[in-house]
Amino acid sequence: MMTTTVQKNCWRLDQTMLGLEKPGSSDISSSSTDTSAISPISVSSMPLSPDKEKKKISFVRYNPDIPQIVTSFKGYQKLMYQGYRYNIYQIAPERNFKSWRCVCAKKMHDGQWCKCRAETTMDNKNACTKGSHNHPPRHHVAEIEFIKSQLYSAALENPDHDAGDLVNQASMYLSDGVMFDNKESIKKSLVVARNKDGKPKKPRSKRMMKFEVDDDDENEYKMPKLETDISCFLPFINNMVKVEPPFSHTPTIQIPQPIPTPIQHQQQEQSNLLQPATLNGMNNPWMGMEDHLAMIWAANAMLNPGLDVLSTIAALSKHQQHVQGPSPQQAATAPTTASLSSNLSVSSFTPQMPKEASIAIPAPLQVLNLKDLKPLPPLANIQTSPVIQAANLLLPVAALKKDSSTQTTEEIKVSQCLTSGCGCRVIRICCCDEGVCRRTAAC
């Protein structure tokens, strides 16, 4: 009781300060009247606001004789006319013309499709059909789609209205015997349509580079745009890369006729005979070889990847120097092997060479086809080729004398290679008798 009295006195003091109660009015009857005005019963009996009341949504009933345009949940337009449904096919604003195609086009079970068309003006009036349908009209399907289209528009115009109540109100405008197949599915479709309404679509393009930047440095990390087309760089790339034709095209090598020139210019003229297409555009003036030998070697070098290029070039160069004779510089710096006896000269070896060891110089060819060339033997057997054998005959005799002293009689008779560990055969003439070298005393 004491607590209740204190609360009442405090309430009266507040009312007095606010000017709602005159001072001195402290009777119990007045206090009870004031408290009853804010009781829960009086609050619950107050009328609800207009927003909380159920709003009536008006729908238009289906009429098959009037062309009506509907919009599906996906945003596509359809024409409902005389129980048939049409999809938009062509729009021509300059002609005030719209063309519609039947929805049963290319969807018939018997393999045939409806070819009927409908035409309207741009304001969806003055509908007329072109052709005849090969199927009966489906009025109940057209009516359901027509009401669903109105539901879609009403849900977007009234976002606070309950979706279930909208579906129930729309069901009242259906004809007798026509009803929605699944009301819950329609409710979910309305909710999804409301959530997507007003939201921007996600961009299809994805960022190639993902990194976090500050707001101040945002402009510094933007990808630059190409001002010109990339095709302008193609000539520059073509100048850097040289495209060679594959060997499957069987290119031919043109070999011109040799022109008689002085000896001092012969080496330069022969080096110019090498075509750039054969050696990938490289001129080799240090290769003093004849034109047909050079072309044969170059073609075999391309066909045989195991060719020892350096040793073959050295052998061919020595053979060419022997055929042409020493140059003035080589004659001045000739080794002491020139004082050897005439019976050991190079000319003495030439008649005794077998046929397979001699180099047959063919007649000059005009066109050399790469298909006619045979690849050289592998690297392990390259020393037995005629070119290498002829080059071994041109080696200085001093080198032969130094190695021949270490050979046995059996090795000299079978003509084995002077190099230890090599199984190749060397074609030469032995000057020894019964295992005794006749030149040992001369050395």
From Swiss-Prot:
GO terms for biological process: negative regulation of transcription by RNA polymerase II; positive regulation of transcription by RNA polymerase II. The keyword Glycosyltransferase does not apply. Its main location: nucleus. A zinc finger (FLYWCH-type) spans 69-135. It comes from the Eukaryota. One of its GO terms (molecular function) is RNA polymerase II cis-regulatory region sequence-specific DNA binding. Residues 25-42 have a biased composition (Low complexity). Residues 22-49, 251-271 are annotated as: Disordered. Keywords: Developmental protein, DNA-binding, Metal-binding, Nucleus, Transcription, Transcription regulation, Zinc, Zinc-finger. Disruption phenotype: RNAi-mediated knockdown causes multiple defects, including embryonic lethality, slow larval growth, abnormal tail morphology, constipation, abnormal vulva, and abnormal pharynx. Residues 46-203 bind DNA. It is found in: Nucleus. InterPro entries: Znf_FLYWCH. GO terms for cellular component: nucleus. Putative transcription factor. Binds to specific sequence motif 5'-[TC][AGT]TGCC[GA][AT]-3' in regulatory elements of target genes such as myosin myo-2. May modulate gene expression, perhaps acting in opposition to transcription factor pha-4. Involved in morphogenesis, perhaps especially in formation of the pharynx. Plays roles in molting, feeding and morphology. This is FLYWCH-type zinc finger-containing protein peb-1. It comes from Caenorhabditis elegans. The gene is peb-1.
